[in-house]
Amino acid sequence: MKNYVVSDPAIMMGKPVISGTRITVELILEKLAAGETFDDLIEAHPKLNKHAILSALKFASEALKADVVYPLKKTA
């Protein structure tokens, strides 16, 4: 699969984005977590495609595999 995710300090302050866009991986994750579908994202952002979204998910997965602990607060 082509890697659609790039990071350039001149674009979105270096946040990972989909190549050729200003659509951040963060935005894609937020929209999917809010219940939007791939089709919803593609309709709202025509420069996206299924492979770009999957690439963003793979990037996020790889980033979370780093040996970093993210303490989470328990909610009641």
Residue spans for each PLM region:
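Generic N-terminal leader/processing signal
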Residues: 13, 29, 71-72
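Amphipathic, hydrophobic secondary-structure cores in small proteins
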Residues: 18, 23-56
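C-terminal structural segments of small proteins and small subunits
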Residues: 48-74
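Residue-level detector of intrinsically disordered/flexible regions characterized by low predicted structural confidence
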Residues: 17, 33, 67, 75-76
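Short, Lys/Arg-enriched N-terminal segment that forms or immediately precedes the first helix
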Residues: 2-17
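Acidic side chains
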Residues: 8, 39-40, 67
